[in-house]
A protein has these predicted regions:
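ER/Golgi luminal nucleotide-sugar-dependent glycosyltransferases, focusing on the catalytic module
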Residues: 1-156
Length: 156
């Protein structure tokens, strides 16, 4: 099956803080599984300065530098990005660097982020996601401070 990536990356002051670096490390670890479209929006506070060097963080992706809108954040560009996916026989992993506005990562958020990538992108879990999505299930994750959540939600 074709696996797409839509990724929203907010970089406060166009800098890669500890938390964003952690996200990037984990995303790059699993980059090889995305064999379809790879769309990345890098949101910055000042679109007028030269941020082109940030595109190097996401080689082999369709990367756009966009203005960060604190009220809408990742949802601002999600619909636009999902419309670019033309293959109906595919799945799309959507993620964003949760906590990217924080300079330092706390342990609870780090565990959540690690779980997000691991339980969605390790091969044995990707297979479960593919099977589940082909049976009219919705796949989602939510943040809870210390309690893990089940990734599968029945569509009814």
């Amino acid at each position: 099956m074709v696996r797409n990536l839509i990724y929203f990356c907010y970089l406060k002051n166009s800098e890669i803080g500890e938390f964003s670096a952690y996200h990037l490390f984990l995303l790059h670890r699993y980059f090889h599984i995305f064999n379809g479209v790879r769309i990345v929006k890098i949101a910055v506070d000042d679109i007028k300065i030269d941020n082109s060097h940030l595109k190097e963080l996401f080689k082999d992706c369709s990367v756009e530098i966009v203005q960060n809108h604190p009220l809408h954040r990742e949802s601002e560009y999600f619909i636009q990005s999902i419309r670019e996916i033309k293959n109906n026989n595919s799945i799309t992993f959507f993620a964003h660097n949760k906590g990217g506005s924080n300079i330092y990562a706390d342990d609870a958020h780090k565990l959540w982020v690690l779980s997000l990538y691991f339980f969605n992108l390790e091969p044995q879990y990707v297979e479960k996601v593919e099977k589940g999505l082909s049976r009219n299930k919705v796949f989602s994750g939510i943040l809870r401070k210390t309690v893990s959540c089940p990734p599968w939600v029945p569509n009814n």
